[in-house]
Amino acid sequence: MFLRALLLSGLLAFSPLLTHAAPRTCLVVGISDGDTLTARCGRIGAYERVRVRIAAIDAPEKAQPYGQRSKQALSDLCFREQALITEIDTDRYGRTVADVSCNGEDVGSRMVSQGWAWVYDYNRLATKRGGGLFKLQDGARAKRLGLWADARPTPPWDWRKRQRAQQPHWGGFF
């Protein structure tokens, strides 16, 4: 009996680590780019600003072709709107990685289906969810929507790698 109680208390102690956080309703107060927003969550007098990276997508960077249009598409969908934010993880920049819905619509799905973001299968999240985002991406590509109007658009992860390679390296002399 004691062992069972000990095991149960251990599971309860770690259960928050095993599940996603409960969804939060927040107000979107800023758009950084096509896959990152800032939301104000909480109640009057106890607001918290949260930077949110939308899960399973990667949008063009602001200085990249289609970056500004991607940012505008996310703004049109979510800016000054209530968003349902379901936290999944925290990225290396301290942003909350989350599923986001605005006006009852999944934001990641919308951005991919309109051609403003690529599927980003970090930790195989998109694959584990059944691959629906990949089908939406294939549809946007076939219709040449958004960034798919280019014959060979550069994915943001390749663009960032090129940008880093072009940065001057001072070799620690200064």
What feature does the model see in each segment?
Residues F2, L7, L11-F174:
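Small beta-barrel nucleic-acid-binding modules, primarily SNase/OB-fold domains
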